[in-house]
C-alpha cells in the first residue's frame, strides 16, 4: 500500500517533469496529446480522454471508436483491460480501467482500499446520443463517492453521483465543455442505494436529457433551456462520450474544503467495510448501451470512428469517419500511429522520456464527476433542488437534429471563446482519476 505522503511526493516531482496543457497552452510536438487530466504525453494520452482542443493539433488525438449497442454483464474480467495495456482496439476490449476492479458474485466491484484513490472503468466506445442503463449498488460512508456518467473528450458530461452518507439521494448533473454551473445539479430521491440494486438510466437526444431510476423519470433537461446568448451557443452536452463507472474519495483529507464538505466529510479509513473487506466497494451488475443510430449527423455511428475538425468542439464539428483507432505501441500518437511498432513486435521496450499512460506521471482532474472545489456547502445544500422519481415516458425519437450555434463548420474562433476563462479554472472530474494508476503501478 502506498502512503499518501509518498504518493503526493511522486505526483509533485512528476508534475515538474511533464508539460501541462489547457485551452491557452497546448501540448508540445514531442508529447502532443493532452489527457483528460491536463498533462501531455504519447500512447494512452492520445486515446480515451484526449482533448483535441488542448493537444498539439486536432490530429494528435486518436479517433474515437464509434458507438456500438451492447449489453454487458460482469461474470469475469474478459473484455476489461488495464489502461497500461489498451491501445485502442475496441473489438478486443469493452472497458478500460485504472485501479482495482474485482469480479464477485457476477458483479464487478469497483474497490477503494484504505488511503487509496479508488477505481474507474470507462467504455472503449463512444456514445453520440442514445440510451445507457447501469444496474448497481453504490458504496457507503461519508466522503465515499460512487459515479455513473457520460464524459466526452471535450468535457461534455452527464452525471449520476452518489455521496455515501446520503443513501436515499442520487445527484443528477450535466456540463457543457467543463464549464461549472452548480445550478445544473438536481437531486432524485429513492430507496437505500447501498442496500438495493437500482437501474439508473440516461436517455440523451439532441433535444433533451432524461434521467430515470428503475424506469421512472426523475428529471428532464431540455436543450431549449440551455441557450447562452452571450456565447451564441447551446450549453448542452452534445459530443461523443464514454460511459464511465467510478468509486473515488471525495473525502480525502488532502482534498479542498469544498470537495470534502460536498462529499459529506472526511473518509473513515477504519470503517466497517475497510475492516471486514479491506476496501470500500460499489457493485455493478450490468450496463446496457443503445446507440442513437441517426441516419445523418449528429448522432450517427455508421463509420469506424469519430474525430473533430474544429477546436470549437461542438456537435457540428464531429466527423463520423473510417479512420483507424489502434496504436502500434504506447509511443505512438494520432499523427504517427505506428511509432514503436518494431519494438512492440519484438517484445522489447523502446527508450522514451515521454509519458505514455495518463495518471502514471502526474495528478490532475478530469472526467469522473465534478470536484466541487468551488462549493463550500454540503451535497444536500449545494443542490438546486430535488425530485422524487415519477412515472412518465422517455423517448429517443423526434429530435430536431440541432446544429450548434449558427450551424457552420468553420474552424475559426467564435463567440465560444468568451467561455475560455471559465473553462480554464475548472478541473473537471474526480480528484482521484489522474492518480489511480500511480497507486496501481507502485503496488506491483
From Swiss-Prot:
Principal location listed in the UniProt entry: membrane
Topology with respect to the bilayer: Lipid-anchor; GPI-anchor
Gene3D superfamilies in UniProt: 2.60.120.200
Ranges of residues in domain GH16: 57-271
Cysteine disulfide partners in this protein: 27-34
Lipid-acceptor residues (GPI-anchor amidated serine): 415
GO molecular function terms noted in the UniProt entry: glycosyltransferase activity; hydrolase activity, hydrolyzing O-glycosyl compounds
A biological process from GO: chitin metabolic process
Residues of the signal peptide: 1-19
Family: Belongs to the glycosyl hydrolase 16 family. CRH1 subfamily.
Protein name: Crh-like protein 3
The species this protein was found in: Botryotinia fuckeliana (strain B05.10) (Noble rot fungus)
Organism lineage string: Eukaryota, Fungi, Dikarya, Ascomycota, Pezizomycotina
Gene responsible for this protein: crh3
Amino acid at each position: 500500500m502506498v502512503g499518501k505522503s509518498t504518493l503526493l511526493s511522486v505526483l509533485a516531482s512528476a508534475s515538474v517533469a511533464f508539460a501541462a496543457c489547457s485551452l491557452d497552452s497546448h501540448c508540445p510536438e514531442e508529447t502532443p496529446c493532452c489527457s483528460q487530466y491536463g498533462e501531455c504525453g504519447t500512447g494512452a494520452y492520445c486515446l480515451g480522454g484526449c482533448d483535441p482542443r488542448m493537444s498539439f493539433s486536432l490530429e494528435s488525438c486518436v479517433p474515437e471508436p464509434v458507438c456500438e449497442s451492447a449489453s454487458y454483464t460482469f461474470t469475469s474480467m474478459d473484455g476489461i483491460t488495464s489502461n497500461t495495456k489498451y491501445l485502442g482496439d475496441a473489438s478486443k476490449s469493452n472497458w478500460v480501467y485504472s485501479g482495482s476492479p474485482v469480479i464477485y458474485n457476477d458483479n464487478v466491484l469497483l474497490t477503494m482500499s484504505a488511503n487509496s484513490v479508488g477505481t474507474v472503468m470507462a467504455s472503449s466506445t463512444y456514445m453520440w446520443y442514445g440510451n445507457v442503463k447501469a444496474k448497481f449498488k453504490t458504496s457507503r460512508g461519508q466522503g465515499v463517492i460512487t459515479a455513473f456518467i457520460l464524459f466526452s473528450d471535450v468535457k461534455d458530461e452527464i452525471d449520476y453521483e452518489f455521496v455515501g452518507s446520503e443513501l436515499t439521494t442520487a445527484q443528477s448533473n450535466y456540463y457543457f465543455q467543463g464549464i461549472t454551473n452548480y445550478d445544473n445539479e438536481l437531486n432524485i430521491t429513492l430507496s437505500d442505494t447501498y442496500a438495493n440494486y437500482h437501474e439508473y438510466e440516461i436517455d440523451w437526444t439532441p433535444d433533451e436529457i432524461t434521467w430515470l431510476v428503475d424506469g421512472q423519470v426523475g428529471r428532464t433537461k431540455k436543450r431549449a433551456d440551455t441557450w447562452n446568448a452571450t456565447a451564441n451557443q447551446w450549453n448542452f452536452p452534445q459530443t461523443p462520450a464514454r460511459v464511465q463507472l467510478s468509486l473515488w474519495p471525495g473525502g480525502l483529507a488532502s482534498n479542498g474544503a469544498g470537495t470534502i464538505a460536498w462529499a459529506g466529510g472526511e473518509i473513515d479509513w477504519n470503517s466497517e467495510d475497510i475492516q471486514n473487506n479491506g476496501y470500500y466497494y460499489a457493485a455493478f451488475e450490468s450496463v446496457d448501451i443503445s446507440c442513437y443510430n441517426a441516419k445523418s449527423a449528429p448522432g450517427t455511428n455508421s463509420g469506424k470512428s469519430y474525430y473533430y475538425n474544429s477546436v470549437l468542439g461542438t456537435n457540428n464539428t464531429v466527423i463520423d469517419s473510417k479512420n483507424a483507432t489502434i496504436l502500434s505501441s504506447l509511443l505512438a500518437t494520432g499523427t504517427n500511429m505506428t511509432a514503436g511498432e518494431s519494438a512492440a513486435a519484438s517484445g522489447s521496450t523502446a527508450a522514451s522520456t515521454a509519458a505514455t499512460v495518463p495518471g502514471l506521471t502526474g495528478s490532475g482532474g478530469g472526467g469522473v464527476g465534478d470536484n466541487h472545489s468551488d462549493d463550500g456547502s454540503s451535497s444536500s445544500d449545494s443542490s438546486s433542488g430535488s425530485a422524487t422519481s415519477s412515472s412518465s415516458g422517455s423517448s429517443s425519437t423526434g429530435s430536431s437534429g440541432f446544429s450548434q450555434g449558427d450551424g457552420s463548420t468553420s474552424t475559426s474562433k467564435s463567440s465560444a471563446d468568451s467561455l475560455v476563462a471559465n473553462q480554464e479554472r475548472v478541473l473537471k472530474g474526480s480528484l482521484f482519476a489522474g492518480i489511480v494508476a500511480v497507486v496501481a503501478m507502485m503496488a506491483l
